[in-house]
Amino acid sequence: MQLINNIMQNLKGKTALVTGGGRGLGKAVALALAAEGVNVAITGRNENNLKSVVAEIESKGVKSSYSVFDVTDKKQVFASLEKLQNDFGKFDILINNAGIAAFGGILEMDEEQWEDIVKTNLFGPYYVVKAVVPGMVEKKSGDVVNISSTAGLKGNALTSAYSASKFGLIGMSESMMFELRKQNIRVTTLTPSTI
């Protein structure tokens, strides 16, 4: 119990970015971090959801902000996160949560939809890492949590696009862990089941 208390005390006053923070798992993580005294910025595509979550976060006595963008748009990601970091400060914690899912047979799924899933679930986190992690390297400290899925551990019928994107995210995370650990940056992958 003492170890858990020490970890929680170490979170107080830190800054976190949660992508896909307007609903679901991202919202839950953002609120949990805020409850531990972490200042939390969130991103997503629905401004009304983001505004509502920011109000909930701020009600916990911490600072919060949001930015509306699509993680598949590299220019939006870099411009929005540069502005957020100028206003909010460099992030100590990155939760790469934004993602989408659609299911269908590999021969039936439309190529554009297949590509969109991979762009959102793999390129999106990559763009966010490229925008945020240099600040962690500069500070020689940080935590990156990439949200993958059990579908990234084992493929199944009708999950080719989703599984490919989540397998890729696990591989990216593992490589990042080896690359960044010398700068005191921890990289973790979570693999939840269906949410």
Residue spans for each PLM region:
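Residue(s) in the substrate-gating loop at a strand-loop-helix junction
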Residues: 149
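Active-site loop immediately N-terminal to the catalytic Tyr-X3-Lys motif
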Residues: 107, 154-160
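Alpha-helical segment proximal to the catalytic Tyr-Lys
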Residues: 134, 178-179
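Conserved glycine-rich cofactor-binding loop
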Residues: 22-24
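The beta1-alpha1 cofactor-binding region of Rossmann-like NAD(H)/NADP(H)-dependent oxidoreductases
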Residues: 47-48, 68-80, 111
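Substrate-binding pocket helix/loop in short-chain dehydrogenase/reductase
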Residues: 105-106, 113-118
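Active-site helix of classical SDR
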Residues: 129, 165
